[in-house]
Amino acid sequence: MNWKEKVKTKFYSCDRFVRFVIQHFIQDDCTYIASALAFTSLLAVVPLMSVGLAIFSSFPVFQGLAEPVQNFIFDNFVPATGKIVQSYLQQFTSQVSKLSIWGVVFLIFTALLVMFTIERAMNKIWRVSSSRHGVSAFLLYWAIISLAPVLLGLSLAASSYLFSMPILADHRAPYTILHYSPFFLSLIGFTFLYVVVPNCPVKIRHAFWGGLVAAILFESAKHAFAYYLIRYNTYELLYGAFATVPIFFIWVYWVWIITLLGAEISYAFSVHHQRRGGKSLDGFSHALLWLHQLWIAQQHGKGLSFNDLVDASKQPFAVDVDEMINALIYHELIHATADGHYMLSRDLSHVTLYDLTQLLPYRLPTHLELQYSKASLSEQWRAAFKRHNEELKKSLDINLEELFKKTGTILK
């Protein structure tokens, strides 16, 4: 393959990737989910700040850093209107100490509700049917809410210590680090979100690429939004003193659009098999191929991971891989192990090809599909399917008019 063909192949691969991301972004209703998350976030921003500041202030080492942390967040992550929003939120959070025990419980519940909504959105993108429940969900949500301010405080404390060192104080390095720190914190935050929140394994490198795109878009959106507010602030003309509320809501909405787009990119990297080119492998051949690979693995006393099954064929799959796994599990042909691998659940010496046709909701491959599956199916399989198609053709070689004449009149 010469360099022109390589460039052409890469171009088509990138084109399929972009189309895949856009298609799934639309299919998953990400714009609608972003609006729901923006509304929920506005309701929970005061509870989240209150819980975060309470945890932050409980550590003596962070005494005196609460205000710098707030200033850093609103200066670097909320464009233009950050100071106004910050002053309002500080007024609201100052009233938290006057709440009753039930008021505090409601604040914590609202903060956890945001995390639950975020997890549902991520699970929808990653095609996960069930969310976390009970103690595991509470521990994860609470860990994220409680660790975020602590980690941010540690990073600021470490930065302050480094900047005060004589060896760095006279150099430009601290200012360069400070200038780019919002971008790197955004990158870490997005990557962490894509790895931890979905209720399924996500590789760090896949989450990183989604986080990188999201962080770049986030920084670009900050500057674009600030430029718009300075030059073309129509909301201030319309709403006057109340303009801060719709402006802040629109900004939060765009942040969630960017976050969900980054999640779709991470998901696209995770399911590379769905972006393959060429003719698709039919559902029945797909199932048979997986059972064959699991049977081989069983001979060596081991199971196969999801990626092992996906890589069994280089063709794209006509049936969604998650749907295929659920179908095989439902009919008790395979099961998932504790370590996330898959193994056979039946003795295949007692399962015939006919049994498989009756169990699975997929028809046998047609003559045309067999021609496109030479790379994935053995000659023995293709010969068996061909004999079946020929025998089926002989059995059903009767035209519909003749069939209907023999049936007689049913409707009166």
Curated annotation (Swiss-Prot):
The domain of life for this entry's organism is Bacteria
Entry's transmembrane regions: 36-56, 99-119, 137-157, 177-197, 210-230, 241-261
InterPro entries found in the cross-reference section: UPF0761_bac, Virul_fac_BrkB
Q: Name one Pfam family in it.
A: Virul_fac_BrkB
User: Which keywords does the record carry?
Assistant: Cell inner membrane, Cell membrane, Membrane, Transmembrane, Transmembrane helix
Whether Phosphoprotein counts among this entry's keywords is no
Q: What is this protein's name?
A: UPF0761 membrane protein LPC_2650
Q: Source species, please?
A: Legionella pneumophila (strain Corby)
- Taxonomic lineage from the root: Bacteria, Pseudomonadati, Pseudomonadota, Gammaproteobacteria, Legionellales
